[in-house]
C-alpha cells in the first residue's frame, strides 16, 4: 500500500463529517418507515468512511524499498509528530493555538532572562577587568587576553 499523506487523511475526515451531517439532516427529517432505508444507507456510508479513515491512519512501519517522501505542503502521515501536550489540549476541548501561544510566551520570557544574565555577566567582566588593570598592572597582559577571548572591551577603547 502506498504511503498515506496528510491530505488523504484530511479528505477522509471531511468525508466522515459530510456523512455525519447527512445523517443529522436525515434524523431531523425522519418521517418513519419510508425514510428508514435512506437513513440506514447513510449510516452504512458513514461506517465505510470510518473504516477507510481507520485503515489510512493505522501505523505502518516504513518498508526498506519505500523511498517516497511527501512534499512540504503534503507530508506523509508517519512523518507528522505532535507534542503530547497538544493532544492533551485537544482532548480537554481546548484550542491548540492556546498551547502554542503559551509556549512561545514561555520561550520569550526565558530568552529575556538569559539575555539579562548575559548582559549582567558582560558588565561584571568589564568592571572586574578595569579594576584588575588598575589594582594589578603586572597582570594587564593576561586581563587583555581574557577580554579579547570573551569579547570584552579593551583598555584602549574604554572611556
Curated annotation (Swiss-Prot):
Keywords: Activator, Nucleus, Transcription, Transcription regulation. InterPro entries: Mediator_Med10. Its main location: nucleus. GO terms for biological process: regulation of transcription by RNA polymerase II. It is found in: Nucleus. It comes from the Eukaryota. One of its GO terms (molecular function) is transcription coregulator activity. Residues 54-77 are annotated as: Disordered. Belongs to the Mediator complex subunit 10 family. Component of the Mediator complex, a coactivator involved in the regulated transcription of nearly all RNA polymerase II-dependent genes. Mediator functions as a bridge to convey information from gene-specific regulatory proteins to the basal RNA polymerase II transcription machinery. Mediator is recruited to promoters by direct interactions with regulatory proteins and serves as a scaffold for the assembly of a functional preinitiation complex with RNA polymerase II and the general transcription factors. This is Mediator of RNA polymerase II transcription subunit 10.
